[in-house]
Design a protein with these regions (language model features):
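Compact alpha-helical subdomains of small soluble proteins
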Residues: 72-161
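Bacterial N-terminal signal peptides that target proteins for export
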Residues: 1-10
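Immediate post-signal-peptide N-terminus of mature secreted/exported proteins
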Residues: 25-72, 148-161
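Sec/Tat signal peptide C-region and signal peptidase I cleavage site
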Residues: 19-25
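Bacterial N-terminal signal peptides
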Residues: 10-19
Length: 161
C-alpha cells in the first residue's frame, strides 16, 4: 500500500514541488481548498494532464534545484503564476490544452483523491469529509496509467534530487 501512496504523491505533486519548493496544501486559502475538493476528475482532463506531463518532461532540468527554499505562494493563483515564470512551462501546458492553474488543480485533486483511495483501503478506512466518491473511483479506474505518469515525474520530486 505504501508504494501506491508514493506513486500517487509523485504523479500529482512532483512537478509542482520541484517548481515551488514544499507548498503545503493547508497553506492554501479556504477558497482554493474548496475548489480542489469540489473539482471533478474527468477523462478529458486526464488526457490533457497526460499530454502536459509529457510536454513538461524536457523542462525538468530547468526547474529550480533548491527544494528547501520556501518561496512558494500561498494560493493556487500565486503558485500558477510561479509555474508560468519558469521558461517554457506556460507554452508546454498551453500545447497540452491546459493552463498552469488547471494543471495544479487537476494535480492536487488527483493527490487528494489518491490519498482518499489509499485511506479507504486501510482497515476501518472511511471516505474523508468533502471527498467525492466519484473522484476516488476515477482514481482507482486510472491507477495503472497514473503510476506510469508517476515514473515520468519521479525525477522532479525533491526527495529524488
Amino acid at each position: 500500500m505504501f508504494n501506491t501512496f508514493q506513486t500517487t504523491l509523485a504523479v500529482t505533486v512532483a512537478f509542482a514541488l520541484a517548481l515551488l519548493a514544499p507548498v503545503v496544501a493547508q497553506s492554501l486559502t479556504d477558497r482554493d481548498t474548496n475548489e480542489i475538493a469540489g473539482y471533478a476528475l474527468t477523462d478529458a482532463a486526464l488526457a490533457k494532464y497526460t499530454k502536459a506531463v509529457h510536454k513538461l518532461q524536457p523542462l525538468m532540468e530547468q526547474l529550480p534545484q533548491d527544494c528547501d527554499q520556501d518561496e512558494g505562494s500561498q494560493s493556487l493563483d500565486g503558485t500558477a503564476a510561479r509555474m508560468d515564470g519558469v521558461p517554457g512551462v506556460k507554452a508546454a501546458l498551453k500545447a497540452a490544452g491546459m493552463t498552469s492553474r488547471e494543471y495544479l488543480l487537476f494535480s492536487w485533486s488527483l493527490f487528494q483523491n489518491g490519498m482518499a483511495a489509499w485511506a479507504l483501503e486501510q482497515p476501518g478506512g472511511k471516505l474523508p469529509p468533502g471527498v467525492k466518491m466519484a473522484n476516488v473511483n476515477f482514481y482507482r479506474k486510472h491507477e495503472a496509467e497514473l503510476k506510469k505518469l508517476g515514473e515520468l515525474t519521479k525525477q522532479a520530486d525533491c526527495d529524488n534530487r
